[in-house]
């Protein structure tokens, strides 16, 4: 397994170009199964989960190519089963189910894998498809969906806010007969992006970005060209990297309006921030950040995917900050690793109390999930001495060339190839 070797401390400064958002690219790639004509998807990040998805779409019979953009022609799809060998590494595979049953009347997906963060069941996806008229069976580790004729529009009230299930219901409803209303829908920018992509192919979706999405079913979707929005979590991660090192950064190809909660907290921490249409700059003027209190919440609240990075910020800040995680259980796995580097923190159920220290020390640490592992790499950049981050395949699932981008900001980081 590959590792990162990071030598610190360094002050990170310079420019970084933000990649397309994985969490928008994945649902968009799966939603392309609904289209009868070729689509071109631009600004797709080069990541393991994206490669797996392209492989999966190919196995279903789609023609998939990558040359700059990703090109998908789902016209020839003639296989309706997403097999275990591809699904096991990636939870997002469940997103194949809605489009398959909506367009072809049948679909089956092996129960998914992915990051080990708490309970993330697929039951909300299943109940949503059932309300649209699909018959669902769970057999031999597969979720099997079928419908005679077309799915039927329905008024669906989500039990709890779920990005994944909102995508499933919204994509399936585009080809359903009649109108579907999703109440208590997720409002994330990646949902908006997926809806905008579907509309570009001829879908009729309104209300994306609010908690009430209305989808008027259409007979078919055609082709089109679409550009994936910038990755707000990657943007936030690099902004934190500069903030904790007293540095200065310019993020290009960013989308500031997707990061309001994060930018507000960085300003509270003492960062000088400016934004333009597609850029964000942050300058700490060499200062140490001030501790901030953070409570994660569904969008437009503070994103859970930025929690680990802000935990680290608090652990090296002036003062004491409290982090409350309301979205996922089991999401403080980075803290014991940071304590090995000299951090001071106590965890009480879903709350972490972080006491800032002036300096962390390099240590051997282990990545446990995608965002936690990013915080360990950033910790290595500012710690005294050498940090080895093990199991970095987690990082490769969500960050495109993170070591190259950090090196360009002055970090001393190398990938060490594993056996």
From Swiss-Prot:
Residues recorded with modification 2-(S-cysteinyl)pyruvic acid O-phosphothioketal: 115
GO biological process: cell division; cell wall organization; peptidoglycan biosynthetic process; regulation of cell shape; UDP-N-acetylgalactosamine biosynthetic process
Top-tier EC class: transferase
Alphabetized UniProt keyword annotations: Cell cycle, Cell division, Cell shape, Cell wall biogenesis/degradation, Cytoplasm, Peptidoglycan synthesis, Pyruvate, Transferase
Gene3D superfamilies membership: Enolpyruvate transferase domain (3.65.10.10)
Any one cellular-component term (Gene Ontology): cytoplasm
Record pathway: Cell wall biogenesis; peptidoglycan biosynthesis
CDD domains: UdpNAET
Entry keyword annotation includes Cell division: yes
Localization annotation: Cytoplasm
Catalyzed reactions per annotation: phosphoenolpyruvate + UDP-N-acetyl-alpha-D-glucosamine = UDP-N-acetyl-3-O-(1-carboxyvinyl)-alpha-D-glucosamine + phosphate
Stored NCBIfam families: murA, PRK09369.1
Family the UniProt entry places it in: Belongs to the EPSP synthase family. MurA subfamily.
Function in brief: Cell wall formation. Adds enolpyruvyl to UDP-N-acetylglucosamine.
HAMAP family: MurA
Name of the protein in its database record: UDP-N-acetylglucosamine 1-carboxyvinyltransferase
Phylogenetic lineage: Bacteria, Pseudomonadati, Pseudomonadota, Gammaproteobacteria, Enterobacterales
Encoding gene, per UniProt annotation: murA
